[in-house]
Amino acid sequence: GTALLAGCVDREGYYNSVREEESHGLTSLRGQPALRYSDDWSRWPRVYGATALYPLYASAYYKLVPEPKDKDRTSLAWQAYGLQQTRTAEAYDSLIKGSATVIFVAQPSEGQKKRAEEAGVKLKYTAFAREAFVFIVDINNPVNSLSEHQVKDIFSGKTSRWNKVGGSDEHIKVWQRPEDSGSQTIMKGLVMQDTPMLPAKKSTVIDLMGGLITEVADYQNTPSSIGYTFHYYVTRMNDNMLKMRKQIKLLAINGVAPTEENIRNGTYPYIVDAYMVTRENPTPETQKFVDWFISQQGQQLVEDVGYVPLYEASPESSGQ
């Protein structure tokens, strides 16, 4: 669905095609929502978030704010007033500037922390879901697993040929992500740690996560590329990604594959938490939204969308 890639949500398109809910990346709640907002849209939380988390925060938002009384364009636009899909860096900037009251993102980069500090804004982080950071290569690449040490060597430039890690005698084509993106922040902080990365070539930094994946898949005839992203984005995000999945594979790390079971039990090495971030003293309506997401009903939505919940999902919500 194009709504996944749009800068903001096509609420009208969604409203007129409820049967296509799945293609818009939205998931129904089980049972009646335990939280409902009033008709006073000015008090609703303003929810911004990264692309990979869109199916989560949009599904919740549309179930918790009132349905428009009229199906005219104005009512529909007001309902989408508080929802904006963006990139991680822009979501943080929106929170710092005050246009967003809660954002759904990965952990902040050093640059984002510094900008908040300079603006005199203290941020509050609430983890609510678990996610894996994964490495993708062409489906024909003979390498199926890398050690953490080998990953560092490849992305620092110390290892530049696949045959050094059990692959073909080919130069490794390393793909990076832009600074301040959620993926690059995790790559530097969790994976590389104190090891400097290769300088990113301009041609290999792709702005959209989907773009990175498309580029890796394009190299199937010379299977020499490696890139990184989030597990959910490449396995569940939308139809285009699923088509690409037939041309790429996810590498095991230290022999442990990034399956949902291994994410849940913590054996896969590169696990990250997804966060809701607010200012230090959020509005009461924003705090209710955050609290709902870590409640049993909110955690059930996390699980139903395809992420791994951090807390217990609702045991009594097995019925619709």
Predicted segments, located by residue:
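Exported/periplasmic ABC-transporter solute-binding proteins
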Residues: 1-131, 136-320
